[in-house]
């Protein structure tokens, strides 16, 4: 069904169920959701009705009377910090300067309402790509360019309308989740006292004659009615709505969750940083221009991580709980995303094994937990809680750089385009990129030995790099890095451009705006001197393959791999390259994994939006299609992906390929395993080039936690630890919690 048909369905159902309106309500549920992420716990218990009304207030007058220019102009004004400065100034004069009134119901109701308004302002700027100097990079812009052929209006409507139902789907896994349903559909919105709110509105320039309290209350309550209607509509038509959404844009939900500017991780970090500052304005006796400027910054920032953070050693509580055949480890701390990225290494002086776990949301700047592997032996016998060292930083991805039998911990800070090296817990080197103002989201991708000198080379990349997000992959020779590591008595900061032998690939000869070259990178696991380098150009739905023997800035791929086959470079002139939407490419190349089995080099390329993994075999620098894995499990809708192939891992000891599917089983998530014997048998059969993956034969594990609310992203990351233990990241555990323990994250050790 087309996107227009989908919206028509929404309109018809709205009319037949007496819903007040459709388009005026766009975003109301989204703003309620972000309110739960940003509102202070101290106000949530008793003042949610005023918080909710405030979170919709800036949009209330836009469509209540579309022909009323005074109302629409005032609505625009309420979207910006000057309105809040006027409102806080009123609150200070009325309540703040009187200790007897400061804690009264009227005071706290007005404060809660204004906090709701502030959360709305923060979300709108990034969500709708309004950030100054970053308008080409926000969520709406990228969705428009990659999914809707640059049609910003269609993308805007899709985001505002269908984004509501994606948000509902993410926080409510099934119809029995009554607590969240009640919050979203409760008729409890309230405005502050009439004398307070109308005086603020008059001070902001709209007279009593142009807007009455009754009119304003009516317009705000329309938002409440719309939120209730959206909830009931989704509850009754969930499967049909999601089928329409995923048929139109399979990757939209991933962008809403994870996009670096306007995605939920970005917005939650901003809310967690900015709302506490806004609260301080209620403690000061007077508001000033410096505070107004800080508010403007909070509502107009690129990711919070853009602020450079100095790493500092801390300790934090870590809890482990044993299950039947697994161990669960978590910091039990809201807004952490613990488990986003994992790596093993000997990272401390005792030369023992440690697990490094990133928690990129923690304290709005992120943290890396360094977990001794020994404690997991204790956890197999009893539950425990201990204090563990962590390093405060923005660490969305961690890795291990092994040189001369020494393990260095790599930590990416994409907001500052820096990669840090840690030796025995001490930061000794930072690699940064200041070659251009359009360097965005650069981070560690992979290590490999391209020059046969036994020194690992480093690859960093970013699909968002450049003014038009064309993307980049940068290769830094290990021989240029090693001297900085061996002279580790002094911390050094080095710009990428100063290293000798650096190679920058940008997808040449293709350079199409928003092609997102460098989304995923993998190096073939082969004993051959010539290694193949696989780089995903995500919005072209293509994996570019380069030879390590011919690597320079203007290198041309020797192969292009798409879902339809392997294209040698000599045949690529016949291909018309252009941006294609995810409903066609299915996120082909979202994950790439290479392994060697009995002298044969295999490469798996996932297509998680179509629940498919393609397997190729390398032979003397040649690539051949070998087998396709397709997940087939009975679900309510085949259009809603199980995200099979989100993460890939080969277990040498078991001789099995592990594949995660975070969206399976009502988004609980699962891990599947396929033996090499079965892969080889199916791949070598000329009549059978597809292997169907099913519950009976291939299901290894369903997320054992049945009670969690919302999506958890189970299996977002997987690695093997000592003694062949599988470690599974569950970074969004607690996603559906609206008050305590939101987005704590956890890991599972099998």
UniProtKB/Swiss-Prot annotation:
Gene3D superfamilies: Integrin alpha, N-terminal. It is found in: Membrane. Its main location: membrane. InterPro entries: Int_alpha_beta-p (IPR013519), Integrin_alpha_N (IPR028994), PLPC/GPLD1 (IPR029002). Keywords: Membrane, Transmembrane, Transmembrane helix. It holds the Pfam family Zn_dep_PLPC. This is Uncharacterized protein YJL132W.
């Amino acid at each position: 069904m087309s996107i227009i048909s989908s919206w028509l369905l929404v309109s018809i159902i709205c009319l037949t169920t007496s819903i007040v309106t459709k388009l005026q309500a766009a975003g109301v549920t989204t703003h309620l959701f972000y309110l739960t992420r940003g509102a202070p716990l101290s106000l949530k218990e008793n003042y949610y009705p005023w918080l909710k009304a405030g979170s919709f207030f800036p949009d209330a007058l836009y469509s209540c009377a579309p022909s009323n220019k005074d109302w629409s102009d005032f609505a625009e004004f309420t979207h910006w910090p000057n309105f809040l400065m006027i409102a806080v100034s009123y609150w200070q004069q009325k309540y703040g300067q009187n200790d007897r009134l400061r804690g009264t119901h009227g005071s706290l109701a007005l404060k809660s309402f204004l906090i709701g308004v502030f959360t709305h302002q923060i979300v709108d700027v990034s969500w709708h790509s309004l950030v100054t100097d970053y308008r080409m990079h926000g969520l709406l812009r990228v969705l428009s360019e990659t999914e809707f052929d640059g049609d910003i209006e269609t993308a805007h409507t899709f985001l505002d309308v269908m984004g509501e139902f994606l948000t509902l789907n993410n926080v409510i896994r099934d119809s029995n989740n009554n607590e969240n349903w009640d919050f979203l559909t409760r008729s409890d919105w309230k405005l502050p006292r009439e004398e307070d709110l109308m005086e603020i509105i008059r001070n902001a320039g709209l007279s009593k004659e142009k807007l009455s309290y009754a009119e304003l209350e009516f317009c705000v309550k329309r938002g409440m009615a719309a939120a209730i209607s959206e909830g009931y509509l989704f509850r009754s038509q969930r499967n049909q709505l999601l089928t329409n959404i995923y048929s139109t844009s399979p990757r939209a939900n991933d962008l809403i969750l994870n996009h670096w500017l306007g995605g939920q991780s970005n917005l939650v970090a901003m809310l967690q940083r900015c709302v506490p500052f806004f609260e301080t304005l209620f403690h000061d006796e007077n508001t000033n221009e410096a505070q107004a400027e800080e508010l403007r910054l909070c509502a107009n920032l690129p990711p919070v991580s853009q602020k450079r953070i100095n790493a500092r050693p801390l300790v934090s509580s870590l809890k482990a709980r044993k299950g039947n055949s697994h161990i669960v480890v978590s910091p039990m701390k809201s807004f952490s995303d613990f488990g986003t990225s994992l790596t093993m290494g000997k990272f401390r002086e005792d030369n023992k094994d440690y697990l490094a776990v990133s928690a990129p949301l923690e304290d709005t700047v992120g943290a890396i937990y360094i977990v001794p592997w020994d404690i997991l032996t204790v956890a197999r016998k009893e539950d425990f809680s201990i204090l563990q060292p962590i390093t405060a930083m923005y660490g969305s991805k961690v890795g291990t750089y092994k040189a001369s039998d020494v393990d260095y911990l790599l930590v990416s800070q994409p907001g500052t385009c820096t990669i840090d090296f840690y030796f025995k817990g001490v930061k000794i080197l930072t690699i940064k990129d200041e070659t251009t103002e359009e360097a965005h989201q650069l981070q560690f991708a992979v290590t490999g030995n391209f020059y046969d000198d036994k020194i690992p080379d480093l690859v960093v990349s970013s699909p968002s790099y450049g003014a038009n997000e064309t993307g980049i992959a940068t290769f830094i020779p290990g021989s240029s890095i090693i001297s900085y590591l061996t002279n580790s008595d002094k911390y050094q900061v080095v710009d990428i451009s100063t290293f000798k032998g650096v190679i920058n690939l940008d997808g040449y000869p293709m350079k199409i705006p928003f092609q997102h070259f460098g989304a995923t990178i993998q190096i073939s696991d082969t004993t051959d001197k010539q290694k193949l380098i696989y780089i995903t150009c995500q919005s072209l739905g293509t994996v570019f393959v380069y030879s390590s023997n011919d690597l320079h800035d203007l290198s041309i791929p020797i192969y292009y791999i798409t879902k339809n086959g392997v294209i040698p470079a000599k045949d690529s002139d016949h291909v018309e390259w252009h941006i294609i939407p995810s409903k066609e490419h299915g996120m082909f190349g979202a994950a790439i994994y290479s392994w060697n089995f009995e002298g044969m080099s295999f490469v798996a390329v996932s297509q998680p939006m179509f629940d498919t993994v393609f397997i190729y075999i390398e032979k003397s620098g040649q690539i051949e299609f070998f087998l396709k894995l397709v997940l087939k499990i009975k679900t309510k809708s085949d259009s809603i992906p199980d995200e099979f192939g989100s993460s890939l891992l080969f277990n040498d000891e078991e001789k099995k390929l592990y594949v995660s599917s975070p969206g399976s089983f009502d988004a609980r998530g699962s891990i599947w395993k396929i033996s090499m014997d079965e892969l080889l048998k199916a791949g070598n059969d000329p009549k059978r080039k597809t292997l169907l993956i099913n519950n009976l034969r291939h299901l290894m594990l369903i997320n054992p936690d049945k009670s969690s609310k919302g999506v958890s992203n189970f299996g977002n990351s997987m690695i093997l630890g000592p003694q062949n233990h599988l470690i599974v990241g569950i970074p969004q555990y607690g996603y559906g919690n609206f008050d305590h323990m939101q987005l704590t994250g956890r890991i599972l050790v099998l």
